[in-house]
């Protein structure tokens, strides 16, 4: 996808209802069509943007949310043709392979018979006909009702009665080349337009799931970075939670990495105090005569290894599907609460309810 012409070709499945921004301008700014809806991704930094509004300029939005993108930093020369990007620099700075491959991800499942054979252990309670699923390019992963496309590696689950595999394939993975070859552009475009123009799937309604971990009214949103040992170390020194949370989120969004040590975080906290005031550190005052010191509390018993592992697994679990690990950071709120499969379904952050303007893939160590 380094070629602007190749990125423009990716927009052949771009829904006609998405008229707020030009596909040509998106391709010129480094984006190719990802889907579903109006989701696009930068070929260089991997940044994803969606929910385009009238007046949005792709190049401006790209620089706003992904200022460290190698494509933006090293791009030179007039737009059009092949973008002049240093391949060596791009290889060092980009987290993903930018060139799109049209080869199947799982070639061993390229045959429909092989895919159908994978459904030998398909649960009886599961919805979805194995014959139809296999015909639409899916094979069974062996877990619950999870299936994957052999070509694009797109995964689907939680099948309901009446779901059509081809329609779901086109809805969530419109750039799959196998889907494009079999069903054609017209089918994909019709699915995209019918689904993402309906009121039930508008940006205002998608993502309002019951049971989502939404903060109660008046309470501050929970920052996932505060559970790290680095953040806990700073909090124990007396720094304010909101200041620690803000710095850690900004650091991750701007650099893609977290603070490596408490001292590094404390240095930035002190610098922030010098700019915004020194009220971040709370100094305990001596008790007055009328105050009686509280008796020391007994230390809590140490957690067992099993309990620590359980808590760690719970912290890293996707808060929507409760199955995969969290891996997507929402922009601009910075919350890290969902996996790559659930992120495309959300239009608002399930934690703070802020509108999701983009997302960045996070790789947990």
Curated annotation (Swiss-Prot):
Annotated GO biological process: apoptotic process; negative regulation of apoptotic process; protein autoubiquitination
Region described as Disordered: 278-306
RING-type zinc finger segments: 318-353
Pfam families named in the record: BIR, UBA_BIRC2-3, zf-C3HC4_3
PTM (free text): Auto-ubiquitinated, and degraded in a 2-step mechanism; a caspase-independent first step and a caspase-dependent second step. Phosphorylated via MAPK-dependent and CDK-dependent pathways during oocyte maturation. Phosphorylation does not appear to affect caspase inhibition or autoubiquitination activity.
Residue numbers spanned by region Self-inhibits the anti-apoptotic function: 186-234
Subcellular location(s) of the protein: Cytoplasm
Reaction catalysed by this enzyme: S-ubiquitinyl-[E2 ubiquitin-conjugating enzyme]-L-cysteine + [acceptor protein]-L-lysine = [E2 ubiquitin-conjugating enzyme]-L-cysteine + N(6)-ubiquitinyl-[acceptor protein]-L-lysine
InterPro entries membership: BIR_rpt, BIRC2-3-like_UBA, IAP, Znf_RING, Znf_RING/FYVE/PHD
GO cellular component, one term: cytoplasm
Top EC category: transferase
Enzyme Commission code(s) on record: 2.3.2.27
Molecular function terms, GO-annotated: cysteine-type endopeptidase inhibitor activity; transferase activity; zinc ion binding
Keyword tags: Apoptosis, Cytoplasm, Developmental protein, Metal-binding, Phosphoprotein, Protease inhibitor, Repeat, Thiol protease inhibitor, Transferase, Ubl conjugation, Ubl conjugation pathway, Zinc, Zinc-finger
Function, as annotated: Weak apoptotic suppressor. Has E3 ubiquitin-protein ligase activity. Weak inhibitor of caspase activity.
Free-text note regarding domains: The BIR2 domain is required for caspase-inhibition. The C-terminal region containing the RING finger domain is required for the initial degradation step, and the final digestion of cleavage fragments.
Protein name per the record: Baculoviral IAP repeat-containing protein 7
Lineage of the species this protein comes from: Eukaryota, Metazoa, Chordata, Craniata, Vertebrata
């Amino acid at each position: 996808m380094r070629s602007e012409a190749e990125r423009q070709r990716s927009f052949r499945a771009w829904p006609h209802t998405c008229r707020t921004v030009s596909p040509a301008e998106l391709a010129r700014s480094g984006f190719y069509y990802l889907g579903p809806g109006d989701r696009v991704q930068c070929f260089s930094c991997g940044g994803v943007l969606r929910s385009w509004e009238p007046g949005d300029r792709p190049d401006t939005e790209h620089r706003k949310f992904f200022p460290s993108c190698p494509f933006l930093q090293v791009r030179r020369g007039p737009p059009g043709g092949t973008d002049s990007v240093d391949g060596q620099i791009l290889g060092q700075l980009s987290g993903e392979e930018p060139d799109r491959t049209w080869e199947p991800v799982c070639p061993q499942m390229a045959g429909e018979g092989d895919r159908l054979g994978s459904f030998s252990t398909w649960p009886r309670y599961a919805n979805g006909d194995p014959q139809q699923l296999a015909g639409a390019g899916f094979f069974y992963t062996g877990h619950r009702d999870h299936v994957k496309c052999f070509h694009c590696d797109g995964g689907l689950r939680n099948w309901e009665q009446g779901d059509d595999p081809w329609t779901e394939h086109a809805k969530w993975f419109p750039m799959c080349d196998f889907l494009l070859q079999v069903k054609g552009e017209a089918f994909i475009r019709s699915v995209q337009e019918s689904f993402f123009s309906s009121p039930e799937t508008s940006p205002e309604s998608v993502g309002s799931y019951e049971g989502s971990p939404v903060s109660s009214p008046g309470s501050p949103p929970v920052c996932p970075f505060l559970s790290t040992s680095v953040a806990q170390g700073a909090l124990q020194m007396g720094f304010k939670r909101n200041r620690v949370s803000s710095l850690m989120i900004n650091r991750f969004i701007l650099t893609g990495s977290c603070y490596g040590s408490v001292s590094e975080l404390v240095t930035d906290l002190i610098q922030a105090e010098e700019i915004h005031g020194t009220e971040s550190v709370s100094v305990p005052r001596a008790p007055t005569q009328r105050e009686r010191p509280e008796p020391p509390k007994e230390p809590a018993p140490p957690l067992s290894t099993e309990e620590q592992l359980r808590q760690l697994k719970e912290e890293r679990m996707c808060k929507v599907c409760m199955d995969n690990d969290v891996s997507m950071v929402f922009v601009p709120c910075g919350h890290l609460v969902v996996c790559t499969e659930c992120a495309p379904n959300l239009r608002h952050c399930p934690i703070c309810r802020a509108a999701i303007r983009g997302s960045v893939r996070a790789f947990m160590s």
